[in-house]
């Protein structure tokens, strides 16, 4: 049940001054992991596709060029053998996937949330808002409700569930948390992004070769932050200040990157033009974002670029003339975990 009360005077009284700040960060990954160099052998064996020799060699080349060393996955050989419908390309398997995801996504989210809460050092009862995001499965009550139960949050915590936001979701959740914190005096917002990319795992397709990229790129993981304003001296330690947050969309590009929920799971299509589309537009958008602050030297700022893939990182670095260390954090995440969608 949600209750909305409108009082303009009270609203003005409670609006606080100052920017929202990140007060704690937590991350988590599954214990199970796969070596990228041997993953093509595992993938084609477990999907009964070893006869597709040309496809396998193409996949091996994609993996070798990915600059990913390993990925952590909820998927195990045992799980796939128990559920062979996950290993074909287009067999109806949504029920199987959903049954696994509705449990695993909140559980992985809890691990990151508990680490953030521990770092924060305050009682969990002081959490006023919970924002949960995932592109892995859809359910009601949602993963936010399940996580609130796992954490033992108060039943009066204000919850918001965001499904199917994809790779832009991590930054979008920070933008949302900033708005919530800056409009709720004393509020402490727990943001959790948890991704288990079981929904995109399936066997190879001779007709849909770009799907091999999804099998090479995505990993499982979760991230959590606690956001609030006016940190209490001696009780809370601000890590980062959220000065400004904005979103933009490159026009006429919706056909280049698409994921659709179907009976076979979450389908994936990514055109080869995506890295070029990003690099052709990134500087114009950076100018608009940083001009109000008098910043035009891209090497003078701290970078956390979503590790969407090595081609994106390389081309953005080249386009903006960034020094190698500027994207080191993004490259490290890509190497050690892969693309974690909203969680990185």
From Swiss-Prot:
Under PROSITE patterns, the record lists: CHALCONE_SYNTH (PS00441)
UniProt xrefs under InterPro entries = Chalcone/stilbene_synt_C, Chalcone/stilbene_synt_N, Chalcone/stilbene_synthase_AS, Polyketide_synthase_type-III, Thiolase-like
* Catalyses which reaction(s): (E)-4-coumaroyl-CoA + 3 malonyl-CoA + 3 H(+) = 2',4,4',6'-tetrahydroxychalcone + 3 CO2 + 4 CoA
Pfam families linked to this entry = Chal_sti_synt_C, Chal_sti_synt_N
Q: Which UniProt keywords apply?
A: Acyltransferase, Flavonoid biosynthesis, Transferase
GO molecular-function term, one example from the UniProt record: naringenin-chalcone synthase activity
Which top-level enzyme class is recorded in the Swiss-Prot or TrEMBL entry? transferase
The reply to whether Transferase figures as a keyword in the UniProt entry is yes
EC number(s) from the headed UniProt entry = 2.3.1.74
| Functional note | The primary product of this enzyme is 4,2',4',6'-tetrahydroxychalcone (also termed naringenin-chalcone or chalcone) which can under specific conditions spontaneously isomerize into naringenin.
This chain belongs to the protein called: Chalcone synthase A
């Amino acid at each position: 049940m949600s209750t909305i009360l409108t009082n303009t005077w009270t609203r003005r009284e409670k609006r606080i001054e100052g920017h929202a700040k990140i007060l704690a960060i937590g991350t988590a990954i599954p214990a199970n992991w796969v070596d990228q160099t041997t993953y093509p052998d595992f993938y084609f064996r477990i999907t009964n596709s070893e006869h597709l020799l040309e496809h396998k060699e193409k996949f091996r080349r994609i993996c070798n060029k990915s600059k990913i060393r390993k990925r952590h996955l909820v998927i195990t050989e045992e799980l796939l053998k128990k559920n062979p419908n996950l290993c074909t390309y287009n067999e109806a398997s949504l029920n199987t996937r959903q049954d696994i995801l509705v449990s695993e996504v909140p559980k992985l989210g809890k691990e990151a949330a508990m680490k953030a809460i521990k770092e924060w050092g305050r009682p969990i009862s002081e959490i006023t808002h919970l924002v949960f995001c995932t592109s892995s499965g859809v359910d009601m009550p949602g993963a936010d409700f399940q996580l609130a139960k796992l954490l033992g949050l108060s039943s009066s915590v204000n919850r918001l569930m965001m499904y199917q936001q994809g790779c832009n979701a991590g930054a979008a959740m920070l933008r949302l948390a900033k708005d919530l914190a800056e409009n709720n005096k004393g509020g402490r917002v727990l943001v959790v992004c948890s991704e288990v990319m079981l929904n995109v795992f399936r066997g190879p397709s001779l007709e849909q070769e770009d799907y091999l990229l999804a099998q090479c790129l995505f990993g499982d993981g979760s991230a959590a932050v606690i956001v609030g304003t006016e940190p209490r001296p001696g009780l809370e330690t601000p890590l980062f200040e959220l000065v400004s947050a904005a979103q933009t969309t490159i026009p006429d590009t919706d056909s280049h990157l698409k994921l659709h929920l179907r009976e076979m799971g979450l389908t994936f299509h990514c055109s080869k033009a995506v890295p070029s589309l990003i690099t052709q537009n990134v500087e114009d958008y950076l100018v608009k974002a940083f001009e109000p602050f008098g910043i035009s030297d891209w090497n003078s700022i701290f970078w956390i670029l979503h590790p969407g893939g090595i081609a994106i990182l390389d081309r953005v670095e080249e386009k903006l003339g960034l020094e190698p260390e500027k994207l080191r954090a993004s490259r490290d995440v890509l190497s050690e975990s892969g693309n974690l969608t909203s969680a990185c």
